[in-house]
């Protein structure tokens, strides 16, 4: 469908295991429009942090180059925690970032909107580095509008909250509530 983008998210260092082909092999076979790289471990249920500099830097840069060569139409996204992650994403040739919004979400949910300045700095830095911006983690009906109002967010990832909200409002009404926030 037009306007629908297929994104595969995972750890690029994940090797084949049982029926799993390995992350890089999977994305090269499927060729999604977007590939989001997260530093999760194999047994991790959900992301709890983004990438930062480390001993994996050169290997990660090589994997990004390989993925760009093998899947020419795929954009490569790097899951990051903070402003330091923006420069890192640019240096290793990612096309976009996904801001880990766990800290943002927790702050907003606790009534502390001072976090908005930090998120705005990340957005501004990403724009200065010509990176597109996605965001996700713990976003919900209460905190999403703050992020949307900042502008320049290309895409948001909302997971668990949709299911929880669906128990209260029903699935269709929940989706309409999220779309209303995003569109307004």
Where are these regions (language model features)?
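Surface-exposed amphipathic alpha-helices with a cationic face
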Residues: 1, 61-71, 90, 120-130, ...
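Glycine/small-residue-rich loop that forms an oxyanion/phosphate-binding "nest" at active or ligand-binding sites
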Residues: 1-54
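Histidine/lysine/aspartate-rich catalytic loop segments that bind and position anionic ligands
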Residues: 42-43, 54, 73-125
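Glycine-rich phosphate-binding active-site loops on the catalytic face of alpha/beta enzymes
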Residues: 35-43, 96-108, 151-171
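Catalytic cores of alpha/beta
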Residues: 15-29, 82-92, 135, 139-153
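Hydrophobic faces of well-ordered beta-strands that scaffold small-molecule active sites
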Residues: 4-10, 33-37, 74-78, 97-99, ...
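C-terminal helical cap(s) of enzyme catalytic domains, especially alpha/beta-barrels
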Residues: 47-49, 111-112, 164-184
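Active-site-proximal loop/turn and secondary-structure-junction residues that shape catalytic pockets
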Residues: 10-14, 31, 39-43, 80-84, ...
């Amino acid at each position: 469908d037009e306007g629908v983008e297929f994104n595969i998210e995972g750890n690029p260092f994940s090797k084949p295991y049982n029926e799993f082909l390995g992350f890089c092999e999977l994305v090269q076979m499927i060729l999604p429009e977007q590939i989001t790289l997260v530093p999760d471990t194999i047994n991790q249920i959900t992301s709890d942090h983004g990438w930062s500099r480390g001993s994996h830097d050169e290997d990660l840069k090589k994997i990004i180059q390989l993925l760009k060569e093998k899947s020419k139409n795929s954009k490569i996204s790097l899951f990051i925690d903070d402003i330091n992650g923006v420069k890192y994403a640019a240096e290793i040739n990612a096309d976009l970032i996904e801001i880990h919004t766990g800290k943002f979400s927790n702050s907003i949910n606790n009534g502390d909107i001072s976090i908005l300045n930090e998120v705005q700095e990340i957005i501004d830095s990403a724009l200065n580095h010509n990176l597109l911006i996605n965001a996700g983690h713990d976003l919900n009906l209460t905190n999403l509008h703050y992020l949307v109002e900042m502008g320049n967010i290309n895409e948001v990832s909302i997971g668990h909250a949709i299911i929880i909200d669906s128990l209260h409002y029903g699935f269709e009404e929940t989706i309409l509530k999220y779309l209303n926030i995003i569109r307004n």
